């Protein structure tokens, strides 16, 4: 790295876990009572706040998990208007060994062999560092 270059800074927004939270209760759940469900509520979307206010100089990547690639690419487009650098999409059944890197100007599949000892995240981060 050139000594005048600043190191790359990236934020990754994990899918699903950042979409919902447990609905707040006003009292403790009594352990003697039976219950069979937990209510979830949507959390506010914070991508615009990250890109505009908190971390405007950082490359922000959002994850999108879907059941088919066409949905991933279509849904990814809305994130670019919110200032993200890219969207990392994965399909439910292939998520451990294949991702789709969606940038404003290109879409690229990144994959490893299913039985490979490496992890897709390692390959993905190396790819992003080389952008």
Show the residue positions of the predicted features.
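Glycine-rich phosphate/dinucleotide-binding loop and adjoining beta-alpha-beta core of small-molecule
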Residues: 1-92
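Small-residue (G/A/S/T)-rich helix-start motifs and N-terminal tracts that mark the onset
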Residues: 1-6, 84, 91-131
């Amino acid at each position: 790295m050139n000594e005048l270059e600043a190191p790359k800074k990236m934020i990754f927004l994990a899918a699903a876990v950042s979409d919902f939270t447990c609905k707040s209760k006003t009292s403790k759940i009594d352990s003697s009572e039976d219950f069979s469900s937990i209510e979830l509520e949507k959390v506010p979307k914070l991508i615009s706040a990250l890109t505009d206010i908190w971390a405007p100089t950082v490359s922000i990547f959002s994850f999108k998990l879907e059941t088919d690639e066409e949905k991933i690419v279509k849904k990814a487009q809305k994130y670019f208007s919110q200032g993200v650098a890219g969207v990392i999409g994965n399909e439910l059944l292939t998520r451990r060994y294949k991702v789709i890197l969606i940038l404003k100007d290109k879409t690229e599949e990144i994959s490893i062999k299913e039985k490979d000892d490496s992890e897709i995240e390692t390959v993905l981060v190396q790819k992003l560092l080389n952008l």
